[in-house]
Amino acid sequence: PEDARQQFDLSSISVQGELQIESCFAINGDLAVRLDRSQIAGDVSLVAASTQTMHVILNDARVGGNVRISEPQTHNRDGEILQQGFIHQIQASNLRADGDLTINVPANIRTALVLLHARIEGAARLYGVFQYVSAAYSKINGAVQVGNLTQAEASPLPAVFVDFSEGVIGASLFVETKGEQPITVHLYSANVSGNVRLFGQLKGANADATVFANSAHIGGSLEIDVAPIRTLATERGRRIELIHAVIDGALSIGPQSALRSDGSNTLAADHCFEVLAWGLRTGGDVAIRSDHRLGAPSRENVELRVLALDGARIGGDLDVRYVRFTSLSRWSYGTSTVSMRHAHAGAAQFVHCTVDIG
């Protein structure tokens, strides 16, 4: 036992074919499966046992094929879960895999994934309930999908954290989220060859989304559409930083629509967000808008507390629609509500916007 865990220790082993570990469990306590510094020529498949909590350690491992890690579920005829395996933590720093990485963790205990300095030659598909995905400095040659980050209601755990800072992604990046907890996405100095799309639905008093992509380079377009579903009036909202980022395609923020507690698709008056994008470079249009199809009155328009585009170079047009400008910034940056000094764009238009300062 180590930290109340029992170990299945396969550290530093060499396997000429495939390695499959399924339904292993500890008699007392959690099970830690150790494959650090191992060398497997083929695929690796790890499946947690039902009713068992498992920890997976793949640090410095070398895998010649695909890596698959999953939690099993047993359902009754009505689709209700009868038994569920749990993977609490996956440590895979410096992992080298010649194939794809697939992680499926649907159980609602929030798995922690550490993927620092990893090298994945194929795609990475990360589905399920994560506490955090820490993949800074990693290189993934294929597409990356992070999906269904559902959190339990009234969860005491902190915000979901997704980090690809200073990483390299050879295709597109898609992050989908929904649930009660706020989410923070870090793309500091990341290099993504394809499109980046961050989307989903959040609900609850603490739900908000924060995106940091300062100095990032995106070879395609960037789309941010994470709509809070408000159940209580709060001062929380969305913060987006794109300072000195380079986007070869277009930038789209919104529609910023939200669902009220009764389920109606109406703009939430308490929803606010801020865009800090000094020195931003885009090859296409920049569109910032709430859902103009709803036709909500101006007092219901989403608050845009800061729009800072000083020194930006927009290759297309700037289009801002259905937002309400206010000066109630939560962040102290010494900037006005709208600041576009020395910015360049093909055209700039503000449609159905209102100003509420002071």
Region spans (language model):
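N-terminal leader/targeting and pre-domain segments
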Residues: 1-358
